[in-house]
Amino acid sequence: MRVIFTCGGTAGHVNPALALAGLMRQRDPQTAVLFVGTPDGMERELVAKAGYDYAAVEVDSFRRSMRPEAMRHNLHAAGALARSGPAAKAILREFRPDLVVGTGGYASFPMVKAAARAHIPTAVHESNSVPGLTTRMLEEYADVIMVGFEDCRQHYRHPERIMVTGTPVRGDFFEKTPLEARQNLAFDDGRPVVVSFWGSLGASHMNEAMLDMFEKERENGFPFHHVHAVGKSGWETMETALRQRELALCPDLDVRQYIYNMATVMRAADLVICRAGASTISELTALGMPAIMVPSPYVTNNHQEKNARILE
């Protein structure tokens, strides 16, 4: 079987696709897999680390604003979207997939649309409790719409196409025991482990709050190990702040731009402090992990708070 997974924008769109690809390869090692995303999105890096082939289609998001800079950006995005159709068709001709699966993010739109028009079976997965703009637009093209939450079903016009599947979690989350994960990270002194992150892109205000938390941890003699992911957008600012506050060399504080070995780090944790993206929630619930969630207020339709409240 030959399968294209198309996704992008944030790790929350990429990780479910990686989980599905891993499961398909496990069931049939001969499955040919191609990921399609944007040329410079973080999906390219995550897919490469997972060992899959990758192709790029130039496409960009649309900004919901009438400000001049947003309108200029949207003009560029409209041009990229128009060019993405022929590029998607070329990838389909070359790879000849039996199935195209979109897992969200604007990068998935041209591939799923082109596949549907070429009469190639298509599926879309929406992890969040409220569908994003891309998956709403793809409803007319997808043969099957998989959703992570039952609550999401009501937002679609074609209930006969909906399958409530949950959000898949990568198999490597279950490969180690908590003890093995801690030993892998050299956290073997019996102290608890706290893991915190604000999504793959980061959150400047929350990272500032974490700096104050780090200082309080130091004042109390670091009663636990702390692994924190800053995110792509705030890394340089955080590096400078850590040096200024003399926190950069603290052995019990592991601050990174991104947690690439999330399966090991989360498995080692006693507590996770995080946003409420659907993929993260699925990983936490699969592991039975205690968590403090701070939903992002800047997402479409406030879907992160709705994701988190489903767990109440």
Language-model segment annotations:
Residues 52, 120-121, 270-271, 288-296:
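Structural loop-to-beta junction motif characteristic of Rossmann-like glycosyltransferase folds
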Residues 3-10, 30-83, 232-234:
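Conserved nucleotide-sugar phosphate-binding/catalytic loop shared by glycosyltransferases and other
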Residues 281, 286-312:
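Catalytic binding pocket for nucleotide-activated donors in carbohydrate/polymer assembly enzymes
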Residues 13-24:
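Short amphipathic alpha-helix
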Residues 87-100, 107-123, 136, 140:
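Glycosyltransferases and closely related glycan-assembly transferases
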Residues 34, 42, 53, 116-179:
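Active-site-proximal region of nucleotide-activated glycan assembly enzymes
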Residues 46, 50, 178-183, 187-272, ...:
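Donor-nucleotide binding loops and adjacent catalytic segments primarily
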Residues 97-99, 259, 263, 267-281, ...:
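Acidic donor-binding loop of glycosyltransferase active sites
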